[in-house]
């Protein structure tokens, strides 16, 4: 049986192996995609187009540049911070704070998932 204790839930997420962390990397689908594929959420993948829903960059839409399973964050084109020396660095965003607006279905396995 899995524990109900919050500390053990947090520890399980923190110590989860990478193949389990993929399940934490889901984001909601836009209403149009939801109707089309009859799914509420999907795993975020590099190449998807997402819209930021929360935070300072809410409303910004861009392509997913990278997915970091180790830190459970994604980077989106157009969402960045500036360092003190003026260089631009991508700002990490948690996938729960974005909405997928366009799926990258180049992968045959992923296309199979959505055609079920």
Curated annotation (Swiss-Prot):
Gene3D superfamilies: 2.30.30.30. It comes from the Archaea. Transmembrane segments: none annotated. InterPro entries: KOW, Rib_uL2_dom2, Ribosomal_uL24_CS, Ribosomal_uL24_euk/arc, Ribosomal_uL24_KOW, Translation_prot_SH3-like_sf. One of its GO terms (biological process) is translation. GO terms for cellular component: large ribosomal subunit. One of two assembly initiator proteins, it binds directly to the 5'-end of the 23S rRNA, where it nucleates assembly of the 50S subunit. Located at the polypeptide exit tunnel on the outside of the subunit. This is Large ribosomal subunit protein uL24. It comes from Methanothrix thermoacetophila (strain DSM 6194 / JCM 14653 / NBRC 101360 / PT) (Methanosaeta thermophila). The gene is rpl24.
